[in-house]
């Protein structure tokens, strides 16, 4: 792939990552959300084949709006298929900086042992992997994807009381659903899904993540 195409891809992926962090409630500046391709080139370079930028230069660390101690790394490994050695390096860095959550943007996937290590480290360390292909567009901006809002525990309690429901009576959404993964929604959480409706203005449904 030539430098121009690769630079464009890296810019698109980083832009989606910034939007994802923002949508999860992490502090991201408007400048980062609005960064143009030209600004990305000026900041990071436009010759990936010569290491400008290297993927590792794109590493992001964000802090949550509600709790600045709740921080999350976003790693961009160099190797196309990520192995256990890289995961150990990331984990070491997370331990040193006392950070328990990270996203890993991979080019082609992970080796079986690297995948297993993510499972073994949970729930102490939460590492989520995204294929870069998934991040070339922001799925939540697609016109067919309705608005998703993650509900707080208090909102769920109020919802169940209002409709005299038990949690297990709510319809389900899979934790592996692309939109659920985008928001980092965990099993047991409830999502409010808002769709436009010609008759009611908007139509709201609730889904329990399983």
Swiss-Prot record:
It comes from the Eukaryota. GO terms for molecular function: DNA binding; DNA-directed RNA polymerase activity. The modification N-acetylmethionine is found at residue 1. Coiled coil: none annotated. Its main location: nucleus. There is a cross-link at residue 81 (Glycyl lysine isopeptide (Lys-Gly) (interchain with G-Cter in SUMO2)). Disulfide bonds: none annotated. Keywords: Acetylation, DNA-directed RNA polymerase, Host-virus interaction, Isopeptide bond, Nucleus, Transcription, Ubl conjugation. GO terms for biological process: protein stabilization; transcription by RNA polymerase II; transcription elongation by RNA polymerase I; tRNA transcription by RNA polymerase III. InterPro entries: Arch_Rpo5/euc_Rpb5, RNA_pol_Rpb5_N, RNA_pol_Rpb5_N_sf, RNA_pol_subH/Rpb5_C, RNA_pol_subH/Rpb5_CS, RPB5-like_sf. HAMAP family: RNApol_Rpo5_RPB5. This is DNA-directed RNA polymerases I, II, and III subunit RPABC1. The gene is POLR2E.
């Amino acid at each position: 792939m030539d430098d121009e195409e690769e630079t464009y891809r890296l810019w698109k992926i980083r832009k989606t990552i910034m939007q994802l962090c923002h949508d999860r409630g992490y502090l991201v500046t408007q400048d980062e959300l609005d960064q143009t391709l030209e600004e990305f080139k000026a900041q990071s370079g436009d010759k990936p084949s010569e290491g400008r930028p290297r993927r590792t230069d794109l590493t992001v660390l964000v802090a949550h709006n509600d709790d600045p101690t709740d921080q999350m790394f976003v790693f961009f490994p160099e190797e196309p298929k990520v192995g256990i050695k890289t995961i150990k390096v990331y984990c070491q860095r997370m331990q040193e900086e006392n950070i328990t959550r990270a996203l890993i943007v991979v080019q082609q996937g992970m080796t079986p042992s690297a995948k297993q290590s993510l499972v073994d480290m949970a729930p102490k360390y939460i590492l989520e992997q995204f294929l870069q292909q998934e991040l070339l567009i922001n799925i939540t901006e697609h016109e067919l994807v309705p608005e998703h809002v993650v509900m707080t525990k208090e909102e769920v309690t109020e919802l169940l009381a209002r409709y005299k429901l038990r949690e297990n009576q709510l319809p389900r959404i899979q934790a592996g659903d692309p939109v659920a993964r985008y928001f980092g929604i965990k099993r047991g959480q409830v999502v409010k899904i808002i769709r436009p409706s010609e008759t009611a203005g908007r139509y709201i449904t609730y889904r329990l993540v399983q």
